[in-house]
Structures are given as structure tokens and as C-alpha cells.
Amino acid sequence: MAVQQNKKSRSRRDMRRSHDALTTAAVSVDARGETHLRHHVTADGYYRGRKIK
């Protein structure tokens, strides 16, 4: 089992975690007022203003 030789400082630990922050989802509102994820089909089947089959 691997065991560290020296204790990592709070600074080193926090620098490693600097990229772990969560981001909010990019939500778009189309012309009809419906919200959806960018580059995704809406719940009622529209994409870029057109009805998808």
C-alpha cells in the first residue's frame, strides 16, 4: 500500500483542487420562451427553430 513520505501542505492541496469547481449548465431561452440546454433538442422537439421528426 502506498504511503506518502511527507505531508502535503494546505497550499499544495488547495492548488490541486483549484480546477475542481462545478459550473452551471449553459441554458438557452429560445424565441418561444422555452429553456433548453445549448445544442440540444427542446422537450417538444424543436432545434434551431425547426420541428424535428
Curated annotation (Swiss-Prot):
Pfam families attached to this UniProt entry: Ribosomal_L32p
GO-annotated biological processes: translation
InterPro entries (alphabetical): Ribosomal_bL32, Ribosomal_bL32_bact, Ribosomal_zn-bd
A GO molecular function held by the record: structural constituent of ribosome
Residue spans of biased composition, Basic residues class: 7-16
Keyword vocabulary terms for this entry: Ribonucleoprotein, Ribosomal protein
Keyword Transit peptide: no
Stored Gene3D superfamilies: Single helix bin (1.20.5.640)
GO CC annotations, alphabetized: large ribosomal subunit
Keyword Ribosomal protein belongs to the record: yes
Region (Disordered): 1-27
Family: Belongs to the bacterial ribosomal protein bL32 family.
PANTHER family tied to this protein: 50S RIBOSOMAL PROTEIN L32, LARGE RIBOSOMAL SUBUNIT PROTEIN BL32
Protein name as it appears in the record: Large ribosomal subunit protein bL32
Originating species: Glaesserella parasuis serovar 5 (strain SH0165)
